[in-house]
């Protein structure tokens, strides 16, 4: 078996090697190349079809194979590839060849020498045939299927090592495929010939002329096909024939047309300080050209300058360029030394000769191929700011090889400028000086270098620590930041913007200069300043130009001046002399000192904006060459702008999108002549115009006019006018049936005759009908609008259509106004006179004169009756008819307005009582309500007449109906009388019948005859016949009929018919009875025929009961199935209900118990780690199925009551017994319980053994050491620190944002009445329920996203938190120090503490000025429901009344209650107790030892600290406009979600009420100056604030309130929240500081100015949004105003516009300076909150990040107090102290922050030390023993004076905070995917490479 497998394995490996070998792969790809058929195959087929002989077939095949072989060789051999594949060569090759081939086929005898005895291979025709096949193969043209197959060999060549073998095998593979193909073609030709020979043999023999003609035509067909194919490929892919297109003038040619005198004078003034001779200019220009154009990769033209690049480009452009023209735009360098460039003179002479070449002296290739020529089908990308035609920025991906970690790697984010610079340096340096190192040597060198640097850095760090141990000052040990200074004595450094040792945002930004176009335009004027070229170094420090004017030559190098320069379009006086000196002497040492001093002189700048004020700088940087256009192309709009300029207008340019210029306003001072229709003012008027673009796709936009369009690939165009391109993949889904849609065209152009069809109405409920109508209405409006847009653009399809339409409209207008309407008036009045009516000439002509035909633009903007729009024949025109004339039969009738066609519009107009007295004229003379809309129905002239006739007819009908009604009533009375008479007659007849019957009986009895059956038919009153039946006694019955008293009467006939029918039915009944009677009657004969015997009676009763039972049985049988089914169902339902009811009760109890048990087991299970065993996260909650505890565990009396989480009374045995009984328990979840550190201490041994036997608990899990000791170090480090005191708003910006928002939106506070709080020790574990709440109800994709986010968040959270002995943390841990603070746990929906807002958090996290979040964040980050907070904020006292000292109480405090404000835990709650707030009150230390201590302001939340009289931000007293804004401004600006927007406008009142209220507040709030109050709460518990009627009882400084409303500076200086007390760097970054500076300068004289300024300056944070519904109305007003401005008497039209609703007066009533209150009340402005964003640099982030917080534990503290901050501005070390960073004891100057030793180093060195230690992490032997040896841990006790300052609980000092990275890199800690190591590849962001240091031990 082993031998067989070995042999089999060898065979497989051998086969794989053969398959992957170069020979097989080459054969395969070469064979595939055969299937790419091109024009070259036409010659092979031609040679075989023509049957010209074997020699020609052989020569054709040989030429074909030779050409293909050369093409294969050209893939490998570069010179041959350049010769055959380049378009230049192919074009030069094809054009003469096509001419020769055409001449060959038409003059064949010219080359035919006849048949001779020489070798036939020497025949010229055979040789030419060989050349034909060879040359056509060179063309490399392909027809079917594409050229991709032929390029497979080229692509695969890069993957093969043995390239020559691959090329050879590819050719062999192609040859095999070619032979097979030709054999197949030969077989097909043989079959065709045989069939043709048998059928047309006679015809061919009889007429030999046809055979020769057939051969000639075959040759011509092949030649034609070849010619067409070649021309197609040449036209599309190769060359654009210059004969077919025009030429553009280049930039230089345009410049030539300017006046030479003006140009030369300006150029000389611009560049030279003194005039020089022509010879000097020539020498200077020659030298500059040789230097400036030495490097082709750095063209100056890319910056937009008009001069050309180099001699190579001049040759390529192929334009004649004289010497003066070429040199006129070159920058003039006076300082360049000609002596250094003597070797360049030969090149200069050659260059001058080349630049003076005429067109016929240039190469042919340059004439035919110009890659920069304008008619190439390329997009013209142009930078609007500069003259450049393409942007110079490169893509973010730039690939280049770089050295990373000692290895050569490809980087995709390599700096392009560095790559370009490297290439330039390679050309400068000789190749022999560059040595290539092996990869191993490079890597070893990198390791050695890194180790040395790490060793040096570590030693430096240790040395600094040792110096500290010896007692040196901390300031001497701390690493100083290097700054550049210009004076040793003054210790003044350069500003951050100019300090080269700094980097980042502190350097500021340099504004981009003017556009080059403006620079060129301004250069013509001498007053605009002088154009200066200096070095890039001088661009950084441009100050002392005059002192160094002649001594700057050292700083100018050839390459530097040629490759980087700066242009200063300055206007200052010192720039006038800034031409660089021509002094050729070296600067001595004395001058060098001066020049170095010059470098430190600073340009005066504005420190606020950090921008240079005097001049803008354009610094040319090293960059990659970008292809540009060498022609100055302008767009259509630029052509229109340049019509009035003197420079010549460009004929060609760039096509824009299809659009029209719409003039919206024309400012004219001269009056126009209204007599002529197209009058123009004498002076050109200023117009304000917009561009209206077409909605149709435009393929021609941004293409150059006249250029040949490129043939798009993979697109199909099959329509004559196709708006969209389609891919062939989707053609099967498009209806491509070709049909001339005449109906669609008629619908577009003739729709003005087509009226809208009436809509069908259906009866439904009112709500459904209204909803449907509204939906249909919107769809209809949208559809109509789209149709109108389509029609408008259909008229723009051709140029002529607008002119035709405009002329038709004008013709229709004249025809209607002056022909149709007057004719109708005449006909009408003549008709009235013929009908003997009075004519109405005056009324009709009055209405006719009232009709106005206003000319409008194409968009409907009204002009006037006589003024036509500009270019209306090309742009289009609309004619609007005001007060359209309607012919009426008489004027007394009140006709309904006919101008409303749509029903919904009709209803709306009826409600408003308005009418639309206008319409638009269509091209067919109809009326439309909107341009290009449907034609509306005009009211009929005869409709009122018909209405009147209808009314009269209705009156006549009414009279006739009355007569008929009277007649009917009389007829009814007559009928009634007749009926009574008839009934009386019937009674008499019945009586007579009865008497006759009696007489008949007497008569027959008297004669002794036997009794016979007598049947008397009587008609009773009910209409039924009573029948007397007697037995038949062997005799026929005698039917006696009653006497016919009333013959032929209707009643008698009915009676007769009824009797006959009844008789028939009775006979049938009797027959059936007789048949049934046989079964029950006995055979005895009846003795008496008139009486029944006993048997008969018995049989009758039996028959009766049998019939009943039979009938009931039949019915029972029929319904038995349904009865049985119903019975079974009832039984089932009863059983099912009984079965469901009991489990329902049990399930209800189980769910309640499960809900209460959830908290207990979540506390026990440490599920902060991801599931390592592959178990789905959604199954984690299986452990919660504890189904049998029910009510025995918890007494749940009320579902909404607060649930206690203290389950300590449950025994362990009972809990684990129930756990073991659970069927679906996930034992992996329980693993975390037993691996938890504290689990072993409380679990009993018996329980452990029992669980171990059950497989739940394993013995090895007791002591489960971590595999990686480095992870142990990490956890040990983490275990020694507190949680970070980050606000949740700040942390929310560091974790995935959207996921966090979704979590917050899902969880809402539900238990509003509960005040139960649990201690930190009991509920440190805040469980994470989003797994259950999310994963169960989400889609699979959301599950995966949630898991991914969870993993990232968990990793980040573990990174920032730790595990200690008492508590274990999961994801939802709160991100603040929670010492003894209590946290909320009173929600139904369990939710993470970090997502809870304001509960158990310091309010300082929300109300600091620095916590302004960015504006680009989503506005859906609402941490709680805004609807639950409603404050009554009319007075400050209301807020004070909410402060409740006692936790959990629901009582309100009295106003006069005293509140002690020491270190007290406050709760702020509204009356409904909807949420709780914790206020961290800070102590005010009265013993301040240093002046450097920063004043930390007391927290001001919504004005709770009462200081409203002089607020820190508003700077106004509360007696101003909208005092509610003043009250809520700080808190709402900082965090808009603290309160809803509705509160801002609660007390919005009129200005009078506001001013009255302000006066009252002003009187009550007098300032008392006897006591200087610091409003920060004192640490003295005796100090308190007493509330009395909303004002503090402390005496305040009295003073008069002046007009500037709150300019009391002293009180403002003492406020804790004053921005001026903040640190200087923070103040510069804060937006409000600039606002406050501006506010100080303003003085106001009245309240109105105060209100306006306060809104514009202070309250821009509230965004005023324009109401979108007003846009339509304002546009209508503008259109009407355009007409009214042109009218002499606009009164009538204005009134009508107001009545019809076109003009809105409420919009016109807006004043120029309205009050904000009125605008908001009118609905014009809508207030929206807007969050501010701040620019944050490294300094600001340092103050915002986490600091070191070592807090004392006092017995009387209920929350943590924060002592004062310490800041020392001299050193960067104190920047690491955060806003919350606190010292151990107040007022201490010792720097105890040195407990973190790494703060000795600077932030950059800190990071370097850590990174270098991490790079060698795999080698444990080389680790620094200081950090990795536990026996050598440093003792930090020497840093602290324990006896004096330390707290007794020394172990708390271990819990300090230490970052892995510097403090300002906090955002990198949470962003896992960010590049942390400053490398250009993203290979080092793995958490596995990060290693921690062990914590420092405090002795």
From Swiss-Prot:
Biological source species: Ceratophyllum demersum
InterPro entries: TIC214
Superkingdom of origin: Eukaryota
Family: Belongs to the TIC214 family.
Membrane topology category: Multi-pass membrane protein
Biological process per Gene Ontology, one example term: protein transport
Gene Ontology, cellular component aspect: chloroplast inner membrane
Compartment list: Plastid, Chloroplast inner membrane
PANTHER family reported for this sequence: PROTEIN TIC 214 (PTHR33163:SF40), PROTEIN TIC 214-RELATED (PTHR33163)
Pfam families the record matches: Ycf1
Name the UniProt record assigns to this protein: Protein TIC 214
Principal subcellular localization: plastid
Keywords (A to Z) from UniProt: Chloroplast, Membrane, Plastid, Plastid inner membrane, Protein transport, Transmembrane, Transmembrane helix, Transport
Described function: Involved in protein precursor import into chloroplasts. May be part of an intermediate translocation complex acting as a protein-conducting channel at the inner envelope.
Region span, Disordered: 256-280, 1581-1619
Biased composition annotated in UniProt, kind: Basic and acidic residues: 269-280
Residue intervals passing through the bilayer: 23-43, 64-84, 87-107, 124-144, 172-192, 217-237
Subunit: Part of the Tic complex.
